[in-house]
């Protein structure tokens, strides 16, 4: 996250411009770090092409899995991929990834240079507190969620935690790659459950 803050300061300082076609000029070059599995490299190549349309140079670095994990843990990237598969039908396994002390927190939210950053707000028990650190906001929300038995309260707090996470700009969900399938646009009503089951009872063809 410290690198993200430095990158943001660079963008503000250099004042990159965007023309009428949405193409950037002067945007800092980015490196996308990924493992060398074919599917992940294909996504990286697509992102390289997509960013290029907007004038942003994105260099793809593909490494074998062991090297990739070590590079990611060391923060050797500007953008990297991260994946996770939950074992229960609940948002918490995913939200818990980004707790300050989580080993899966590869962007180091709430750690290092980011630990003392007090730029977040949190609302608990109807009271909003501003100028909170990641531990005082996100971690506090997770603790309350884990200790609550009230479904409505849990989901309200989980939405708040999700909003905090998205506001950092450190995480950008792409797709659910453990449950990929092709579906003709004429097929309607197909439901895919969060644990991978496909429900066909409401499926029908429209032409």
Feature names for model-found ranges:
Residues 8-9, 39-43, 47-50, 64, ...:
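Stable alpha-helical elements in mature extracytoplasmic
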Residues 8, 15-26, 71-75, 96-143, ...:
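Short, solvent-exposed loop/beta-turn-alpha elements that line the ligand-binding surface or hinge
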Residues 93, 116, 164-166:
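A short hydrophobic/aromatic micro-motif that marks alpha-helical segments and, especially, helix-coil
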Residues 1-7, 11-12:
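Single conserved hydrophobic/aromatic residue that forms the stacking wall/gate
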Residues 88-91, 183:
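Short catalytic/ligand-binding loop motif for oxyanion handling, primarily in non-cytosolic enzymes
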Residues 13-87, 151, 178-179:
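Ligand/substrate-recognition segments at binding pockets and active sites
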Residues 48-56, 73-77, 85, 99-103, ...:
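Sec-exported extracytoplasmic/periplasmic mature domains
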Residues 31-37, 41, 144, 148-150, ...:
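Extended amphipathic secondary-structure runs
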